[in-house]
């Protein structure tokens, strides 16, 4: 009787609820655990670049090569290739360009000018004071061996070094009205001689000044005559200045010596997002949507760890080395125990103890076994809802991190080192916060994703349990054992939620009562084991005899 009962139980029809498993070794971290193996994961941290300078959305960068921004704007003779430049997407300057201020000196508010350039995409150079407009001064003699061109002394192309003429330097009074609709970048300078002899040799007047005025600027400069060490063979120095002249405003110059006059000015014809990048890279004849000083990034990932300074549509920079988002389930593949004919599997195939590698068309589903055979079937509805939810997860993370901290790579002069240090600390602090937020968000979302999948499996289990009620027995491993015959049509009704409980309840009741009559517990577990042991021993003894 006991043997018949056991055989009867083994041959009962079953349906199990389970989840997908595969050979994935992808691992994620959660708030509670590290290195959780999952069926599917998505790396959301871009770590690669192409190592090249590329066009940005089809617009070429302005790569200054051996020229600095100052050398380009003033017109260092060695930077003639940049006399007229087309629209640029961003500007690239080397860390220590060779062709800077060929005549030694300073560029006043240079760092602020560079910051201004990070919002400009195109200049149009226009002539405001032609060399021929200085009849009472030498406009071509102001050259220096410090600025050579083709083996001869030369000077910056966009400004004019005015020298005395016929032993006289008449006072200059010149104005320029900006009749353009665009802002105008105007450059000028002052020469600081080495000694009084050089002062009178060049400008005749021993005491000189330069006055510059606009509606917003009131400047008066005087030369600083001093003995200095030679740089580029020069003991003198030059100091350059700039201003933005608004439309309908005028700039007025007055000077009786030492004046470096503007010949050309820059009309700002296009403003937009740009940047000045410090990079030694070469142009790669490529196109990108995101550029860094290390190279271009072509990625749809929400984060990157390549360089904090970027230009274009870029992922958000974080200091993390790893950000992996769980999109699938916990991956714990379980071997199935199959019978030769019907493929019936045992308790270890349940969702509590392991996932199914045989179910490949969904995340959650069923495995059934009856007289007609056995097989897997994904639950398409719950799987699709889960896919939709997880698909939106990356977008959700992007939305939650949609404010990019702007690391513009600002520069500071020597007098602003404390400000620079403070600025760097603030930038580092912001980046630390962004990194912490990104890492914490990923940990939390991974926890939620895995809990979400667990909940979906439980919901599917409860859906079956509530339909079958006492027409089947819960085996405790995600499987139900029917107390009645359940053919393929019956199995399908359980899966789609249309199972007819009353139709099968009488057959189930009779089988349930029959099984109850031979319950193992009526004999006792230890007695059953004892009987089995005795029978096995007797059989072994008989074989030996």
Curated annotation (Swiss-Prot):
The record marks 342-343 as: Cleavage. It is a single-pass type I membrane protein. Glycans are attached at residues 22-23, 35, 177, 298, 496. Its main location: virion. Palmitoylated. Pfam families: Hemagglutinin. Disulfide bonds join 16-479, 54-286, 67-79, 102-147, 290-314, 486-490. InterPro entries: Capsid_hemagglutn, Hemagglutn_HA1_a/b_dom_sf, Hemagglutn_influenz_A, Hemagglutn_influenz_A/B. It is found in: Virion membrane; Host apical cell membrane. Binds to sialic acid-containing receptors on the cell surface, bringing about the attachment of the virus particle to the cell. This attachment induces virion internalization either through clathrin-dependent endocytosis or through clathrin- and caveolin-independent pathway. Plays a major role in the determination of host range restriction and virulence. Class I viral fusion protein. Responsible for penetration of the virus into the cell cytoplasm by mediating the fusion of the membrane of the endocytosed virus particle with the endosomal membrane. Major glycoprotein, comprises over 80% of the envelope proteins present in virus particle. Belongs to the influenza viruses hemagglutinin family. Homotrimer of disulfide-linked HA1-HA2. This is Hemagglutinin. It comes from Influenza A virus (strain A/Teal/China/2978.1/2002 H5N1 genotype W). The lineage of its organism: Viruses, Riboviria, Orthornavirae, Negarnaviricota, Polyploviricotina. The gene is HA.
